[in-house]
Regions:
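Eukaryotic intrinsically disordered, low-complexity segments enriched for acidic and Ser/Thr/Pro residues
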Residues: 1-249
Length: 249
């Protein structure tokens, strides 16, 4: 992903080619089944004597016929590769994936369904340990490539692994809140902000706004702004922007 250039086929679902290269690297001389099969019928005899070569060759051919099948295969194969990769190589692969999905030529994929970005993020989401993708990158990819679900799931996974005082945690919550707002997922938006806000006035104002009591909410947003400027209580820029935006609304 990081060393091969895909510009020449950027308008195609080029994971077909990636999968073909990966499957071609598999040692197909091994047995088809990991354990001996019981029985003397023809099927059992074929399983005992068979190798993985016909199976892998069939996969290489069939995945070219359907992008959805290739998408499903990638989301199965990539996590398996990730699990067996050494830690230092996982870091390299993580960086390569980020560089790939943020490349300008990927914009050709935006109208396609499925598209390469959706598949790459889906494969990353299934990995353990979780890949680390910058929150602003995930928000951009979700909006640009209609990968809302998988990008929000990835943000949530990353959020659980971050320390409460980590600056990245703040940006992750910002990206997740913006994604909820873009999709008009009001209850998720309010729930996230009510858990993370530092001022009780913010919590109460959000509760009023969620209940449709906008006049009461505006009073509390204004009170929070005054308190934030005068009290010396630690304040994040995100919470101040929330007051500003919602007080105007």
């Amino acid at each position: 992903l990081g060393t091969q250039g895909w510009e020449c086929i950027a308008q195609r679902y080029w994971l077909h080619q990636v999968l073909d290269l990966l499957l071609a690297a598999i040692d197909t001389s091994g047995p088809l089944v990991g354990e001996p099969c019981d029985g003397d019928n023809l099927f059992a005899q074929m399983m005992k004597s068979g190798t993985t070569q016909p199976f892998v060759n069939a996969l290489r051919t069939l995945q070219y016929l359907d992008a959805n099948a290739a998408d499903a295969l990638w989301q199965t194969l990539f996590p398996a590769i990730w699990r067996t990769t050494q830690k230092r190589h996982q870091t390299d692969l993580n960086h390569a994936l980020i560089g790939c999905v943020t490349h300008e030529y990927m914009l050709h994929q935006a109208p396609a369904r499925p598209n390469v970005v959706q598949s790459l993020l889906g494969g990353a989401l299934a990995c353990s340990p979780t890949l680390e993708i910058p929150p602003y990158v995930l928000r951009y990819l979700g909006k640009t490539f209609q990968a809302w679900y998988v990008s929000m799931e990835q943000l949530q996974h990353q959020l659980f692994s971050l320390r409460s005082d980590d600056a990245v945690r703040e940006s992750t919550q910002d990206a997740l809140a913006e994604a909820y707002a873009e999709l008009s997922e009001a209850d998720y938006f309010y729930g996230l902000w009510r858990r993370r806000c530092m001022f009780p006035e913010t919590n109460a104002a959000l509760a009023y706004e969620q209940s449709g009591k906008f006049a009461e909410a505006q009073v509390l947003y204004e009170a929070a702004q005054v308190k934030g400027r005068t009290s010396g209580v630690p304040l994040t820029e995100s919470e101040y922007n929330l007051w500003d935006d919602h007080w105007v609304l």
